[in-house]
C-alpha cells in the first residue's frame, strides 16, 4: 500500500500536464485492478503473456499545445507600459496582465485576416498623409495661419480618394513608431483615465544615459576620474578611441579593459569554416575510401589543411588594427631597416641602370621579372650593375636597344672584408665615389657588346664551358680595356661574374666562364650567381 501511494505521488510531481486529473488516474487504476482480477479468475490461454509491474509503468507523454494547422490569437487591453523606452516623449504603451479574448484561425483565415488589417492600417496612414497635405496647402507650408486648416479631421478625407485595393501590402512596414499624442489617445480609448506624468522624466533620463557611452579619458584613465571605473564596469574599445579613448598601456581602470580584436574574430571564423569543410570532405570521401582505399587521400587532406592555414594567415595580415600597425612600424624603425633591406636584396638579382629600359621577355629566363631600379642601394647589396658613361648615342627604333650599345659596364660585389680593387694603367684605383668607403668594391669592366641575351635556345650552351677556351676573364676583354693582371694573390678579386654569359666580337658562340676561385666561394656568393637583366 505504501508503494502504491508513493508511485501516485511521484506521478503528480512528474506530470505537468494540466489536463491530467486524479479521476483519470483513478480510472486507470480501477481498470487495471479489474483486469488483474479478471486475469486471476480466468487465467490466460497464451503462455507468452507476462503481467507488467505498476512500478515500471511508462511515463505518459505530455500533450503538446503547439499545432501547425491553426493559429491562436490572444487579445490584450492596452495599458501604460512602464517597460519600453520611446524615442521621444512619455506615455509608453503596454498591455494588461491577462488577455480578454481568444480566437483561433486556420492558416488561410489568419493570412486573410492579416491582409485585411494591413489594408485598414494602410488606409488610415494614407488618410493622415492626405490630411497633412491639405493643411500644408491651406497654410502655405505653415507660413500662414488658417482656421479652416485647424478644423480639419480624418473624417473630412473621403474614402474615395484613398484606393488600397490594388496595393501590395507586403511592400509596406506596419510597425511604425507612434507619436506621443497618438499613444495618449490610444491609452484613453482603452480606458486608461489617469496617465502617470512622472514616467516622462524617467524616460528622458534613460535616453540621456544611453547617449553617453564609454568614458571621456584620452590615452590615460585615472581610476578616480574615469566614469567606467567609478561605475565598476570595464572600459570598452571597439575601434580607435571609441567608445573609450584610453590606450592599452594607459588604462588605469580597476575593473579592466576590453578591446575588440578583429584578428581573433576572423581567425575563429576561418578555423570554424576550415573544420566544417574538412569534415564535409571526409564525409564525402568516406564511402569511396570504404570501396577502394586511396594512397594520396591523406596527402591531399594535408595539402588542403596547409592551404587553409595560408589563407588564414593572409586574411589575418590584412586585418591589423591601426594601433598594432603603428606599434609594428615603431619597432621596425627602432631596430633599423637596413639589415632587412640588405637581406631582401641579396635574394634578388638587382640591376641598377641610369635610364629606364624596355627589357624584352627573352633577355633572362632565369629571373621571373628583372628588377630595374634607378637609384643607389645601401651597403650590403649583392650585385650592382650600371653604366659608367651616361652619354650614349641614341638607338634607332629598328636597331638594338640602348643597353646593348657599346659602352663599358661595371660589375660590383660588395663584401664585408677589405679587397683591393682592380687598378687601371694610370695606377689610380677605380671605384665610384658615391658608395660608402667602409666596404671596398671588386670591379670588373666589360664592354656592352660582350653581353648576350639568355635565350631559351642558348641555355644548354651556356651551361657548358667550351673546350679550349681560357677561363681567364682578361682574355675575353678587349685589348684597349686597360686592365692589368693582379700581381699578387691578394689583389685578385674574390668574385667574378662567371654566371653571366658574354661573348666577344671575334667569337661565334658563347660559353660560361668559370673562375678558378669557384671552389673558394661561400654559399652566399654561389647563391648570388643569377643571370642579371642589363
Swiss-Prot record:
Transmembrane segments: none annotated. InterPro entries: CSRNP_N, Cys/Ser-rich_nuc_prot. It holds the Pfam family CSRNP_N. Keywords: Acetylation, Activator, Apoptosis, DNA-binding, Nucleus, Transcription, Transcription regulation. Residues 1-52, 480-534 are annotated as: Disordered. GO terms for molecular function: DNA-binding transcription activator activity, RNA polymerase II-specific; DNA-binding transcription factor activity; phosphatase binding; sequence-specific DNA binding. Disruption phenotype: Mice display no obvious defects in development, hematopoiesis or T-cell function. Deletion of Axud1, Csrnp2 and Csrnp3 together causes partial neonatal lethality, suggesting that they have redundant functions. Highest expression detected in thymus, brain and ovary. Low levels detected in naive T-cells. It is found in: Nucleus. Belongs to the AXUD1 family. This is Cysteine/serine-rich nuclear protein 2. It comes from Mus musculus.
